[in-house]
């Protein structure tokens, strides 16, 4: 049983992305898109953009690409 107060739990969200940094970046960029007027990818009563973005990540509705270019 997961005793996290955050729903969904961070451990569950980390199964959808590469690492914590990616989770923060993907979630924040998606939340910004929602604030700027993009339509939600799921039907929900959630009104907070960050909470909605987290749910979209958890449901596997958000994809991203990791670019592995370093400083040259």
Curated annotation (Swiss-Prot):
Keywords for the protein's UniProt record, in alphabetical order: DNA-directed RNA polymerase, Nucleotidyltransferase, Transcription, Transferase
Reaction catalyzed: RNA(n) + a ribonucleoside 5'-triphosphate = RNA(n+1) + diphosphate
Example of a GO cellular component annotation carried by this entry: DNA-directed RNA polymerase complex
UniProt GO molecular function: DNA binding; DNA-directed RNA polymerase activity
Domain of life, per lineage: Bacteria
UniProt keyword Transferase present: yes
Keyword Flavoprotein: no
Its EC number(s): 2.7.7.6
Pfam families, per the entry: RNA_pol_Rpb6
UniProt cross-references to InterPro entries, sorted A to Z: DNA-dir_RNA_pol_omega, Pol_omega/Rpo6/RPB6, RPB6/omega-like_sf
Enzyme class, spelled out: transferase
Gene Ontology BP term (one): DNA-templated transcription
NCBIfam families: rpoZ (TIGR00690)
Protein's job: Promotes RNA polymerase assembly. Latches the N- and C-terminal regions of the beta' subunit thereby facilitating its interaction with the beta and alpha subunits.
Subunit (UniProt): The RNAP catalytic core consists of 2 alpha, 1 beta, 1 beta' and 1 omega subunit. When a sigma factor is associated with the core the holoenzyme is formed, which can initiate transcription.
Family: Belongs to the RNA polymerase subunit omega family.
Protein name: DNA-directed RNA polymerase subunit omega
Source organism: Clostridium tetani (strain Massachusetts / E88)
Gene name linked to the record: rpoZ
């Amino acid at each position: 049983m997961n005793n996290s107060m955050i729903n969904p739990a961070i451990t569950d969200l980390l199964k959808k992305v590469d690492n914590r940094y990616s989770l923060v970046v993907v979630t924040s960029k998606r939340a910004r898109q929602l604030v700027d007027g993009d339509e939600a990818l799921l039907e929900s009563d959630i009104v907070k953009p960050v909470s909605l973005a987290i749910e979209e990540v958890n449901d596997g509705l958000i994809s991203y690409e990791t670019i592995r270019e370093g400083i040259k």
